[in-house]
Amino acid sequence: HFRRTDNAQSIHNPFVGNYIMDSFTTEVGGEVYFRKNGFLGMVGLTNGKLNQSVENPGKTSPSFVAKVGYDNNLSEDLRFRLTGSVYHTNQTSSAYLYAGDRAGARYYSVMEPVEGGSFRSGRMNPNLRNEMTSFMINPFVKYKGLEFFGVLEQATGKRASETENRTWNQYAAELIYRFGYDENLYVGGRYNYVDGEEVGGNNVDVSRFQLGAGWFMTKNILTKIEYVNQEYNGFNPQTILDQGKFNGVMVEAAISF
């Protein structure tokens, strides 16, 4: 899906923050698309990561991506969309999915030590660094101004130093109501939950609730306000995430072209 915020390109994200496991990567590749009578399909192949090296070409193999789905207006007021996608890399020196980001997290410096400077604040990186397969299912239903969007996601993989695969799951559901002239105003809520196994076998989970509202001042200018509450469970007592939580209000304005 393309619902995440990327720098000032936040028009498609009704909330300030992205998902806890943020599915973002930059890779060079090609894709082939098919569309007919509401059905859609895509297959693609990439170079596996952006910053390649000629010194050890055997470290990274191509990544495979694919998507299938159905998207159609069932009536004048009802739109239905259901898609499933997969990303697979058999071998890479450093997987960017869930780990890389050009913009950084919107919850700046939360759950970080004083001297910390991570761009992943408030996010979870499953650390499936060298081998990964990720599946995602996205249902979307819109009836008049009311819309539902969901995420069912599972990522499995490991670091090169590990012998067994680890699995991470992500679930999210959001409900948005758009109103006003040309639906230029909206209110909504999102629940996001992630659980999985860290390197070393520790089972953890993170939950987040977001409540927000937005105003499209023009089609290119969006202002948002959001309340967020996030909690961490099961983390090592020696880490800052042990029994961690944060909450607060974020205000954001963006101009996107």
Predicted regions mapped to residue ranges:
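Surface-exposed coil loops of outer-membrane beta-barrel proteins
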Residues: 1-69, 98-125, 247, 254
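Basic phosphate/pyrophosphate-binding loop/patch that engages nucleotide-derived ligands
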Residues: 71-73
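Outer-membrane beta-barrel pore domains
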Residues: 78-88, 94-257
